[in-house]
Amino acid sequence: MATQRKHLVKDFNPYITCYICKGYLIKPTTVTECLHTFCKTCIVQHFEDSNDCPRCGNQVHETNPLEMLRLDNTLEEIIFKLVPGLREQELERESEFWKKNKPQENGQDDTSKADKPKVDEEGDENEDDKDYHRSDPQIAICLDCLRNNGQSGDNVVKGLMKKFIRCSTRVTVGTIKKFLSLKLKLPSSYELDVLCNGEIMGKDHTMEFIYMTRWRLRGENFRCLNCSASQVCSQDGPLYQSYPMVLQYRPRIDFG
């Protein structure tokens, strides 16, 4: 009876490494047009200079290829389980970056309990549940009410009394909409648009994704983000700003 061959991690390398940086896929992001997957940082940087897929050369989008990107959380979990220590390395890298570059405008003390990185040596899921993502990298956001004269719903959607919030970079636009609906006491059927720099954001976009692909392009007071060990650092690497990111909200506009 033939013995079953034991597979090594290197056997899966063609499926779990990035075509651009040649390292393991970090936050694997798939191009929906051709289904090729890259590190999120790598593909975002590539699309700043080109609208074509770096692997097959097909045009992804005529004007905004970033709209055709989707995070692959399932593949991310598979890679973390295949490669020992990769998850811990990435969490430590993110934590170190946000400790050095977290915004100061929200008035919170640097040494506050919410900002301290928490070490989970046992990987206890119960501790993660109690944490409510407080040990995630944090980002300061300003939620500004966008008023259009004469638009239906302007009397319902008001500005927040406290429009500055601090949340995890993994929070999605969908969660922000739920937060706004709760604070503004909107009916469950009432829908909002959330915008950044005048562009409507998709409900699955995370704050980190919007920060990197929309807000930082405004071009003032940039700070460099240290690349991970699997990527090549350059002067054109990912950049972050030091002041709160502004998101605007308004009643949903039906374009018919």
UniProtKB/Swiss-Prot annotation:
Supply the Gene3D superfamilies for this chain.
Phosphatidylinositol 3-kinase Catalytic Subunit, Chain A, domain 1, Zinc/RING finger domain, C3HC4 (zinc finger)
Give residue spans, biased composition: Basic and acidic residues.
Answer: 94-103, 110-120
Stored Pfam families: RAWUL, zf-C3HC4_2
GO molecular function ontology, one term from the record: zinc ion binding
Q: Where are the zinc fingers (RING-type)?
A: 18-57
Where is the protein situated, by its record's location annotation?
Nucleus; Nucleus, Nucleoplasm
UniProt keyword Transcription present? yes
User: Alphabetically, which GO biological process terms does the record hold?
Assistant: positive regulation of transcription by RNA polymerase II; random inactivation of X chromosome; regulation of transcription by RNA polymerase II
What are the annotated GO cellular component locations?
A: centrosome; Golgi apparatus; nucleoplasm; nucleus; PcG protein complex; PRC1 complex; X chromosome
Under the subunit heading, UniProt states: Component of a PRC1-like complex that contains PCGF5, RNF2 and UBE2D3. Interacts with RNF2; the interaction is direct. Interacts with CBX6, CBX7 and CBX8. Interacts with AUTS2; the interaction is direct. Identified in a complex that contains AUTS2, PCGF5, CSNK2B and RNF2.
Protein name per the record: Polycomb group RING finger protein 5
In which organism is this protein found? Answer: Homo sapiens
Q: Give the organism's phylogenetic lineage.
A: Eukaryota, Metazoa, Chordata, Craniata, Vertebrata
**Which gene specifies this protein's sequence?**
PCGF5
